[in-house]
UniProtKB/Swiss-Prot annotation:
The gene is dapB. NCBIfam families: dapB. The lineage of its organism: Bacteria, Pseudomonadati, Pseudomonadota, Alphaproteobacteria, Rickettsiales. This is 4-hydroxy-tetrahydrodipicolinate reductase. Keywords: Amino-acid biosynthesis, Cytoplasm, Diaminopimelate biosynthesis, Lysine biosynthesis, NAD, NADP, Oxidoreductase. It comes from Wolbachia sp. subsp. Drosophila simulans (strain wRi). CDD domains: DHDPR_N. Catalyzes the conversion of 4-hydroxy-tetrahydrodipicolinate (HTPA) to tetrahydrodipicolinate.
Amino acid sequence: MKIRVGVIGCLGRMGKKILNELITNTKVEIAGAVARSGSKYIDSDIGPIIANLGIKVTSSISDVFESSDVVIDFTTKECMLDCLKAAVKFKTPLVSGTTGIEGVDLKEYAAEVPILWSANMSVGVNVLLKLVKKAAELLGNEYDVEIWEMHHNLKKDSPSGTAIELGKTIANASKVDFQSNQYLHSGSNIRKKGGIGFAVSRGGGVIGDHSVMFVNSDERIELNHKAIDRTTFARGAVQAAVWLYENKREIPGLYSMQDVI
């Protein structure tokens, strides 16, 4: 039996990539696809998006959660909240890569149903997270930490969810409080000692570049990741969905790509 996977936000850049990954993965099949209400594709076959599979695009999140073994969401904070409620109602595991979700208590929903959330589904970025954690543990607080990220000119959240996740990982490894030690460079103030600095760039169609620097007066250690194609995020999301269903479908909890890899 193949794993039935629903996709929320099927017309978005990530949604289309995920659909394409699903049709090439032998472990899964597409159970349903959701687009926002009012889309011209509602009640049409997903054929114009990827391939004629006899699956119609719907605006009903509930219908897709009810008919799926696991659901993948890459949408907005508002839509993700609807997904979380549906996941709890139908006890359907949820994988989400939606960012900009400040104020959402994922643990509250994860107490009822398995939820896997990551700011970045790329295997490479999750390897980077492990590397910066190890570097922070080895270097302690003797190095200034700087995180720089660049994305396309339409990205709304800043710094990116991935950059924040990198910062939190470093703070935890260094045994410092992230909230009181992180800051976004601005104005003419000198650098905060012991702080985790963030710098942000937006331009063109950049998919996602992240750089973490550990710097003292003698040397600089730099760890980088550059996304070349969004397929890396889609492939990771499908991998996460398969892992969540095969390993945790009956075990409520909050998981991440760090658990998958």
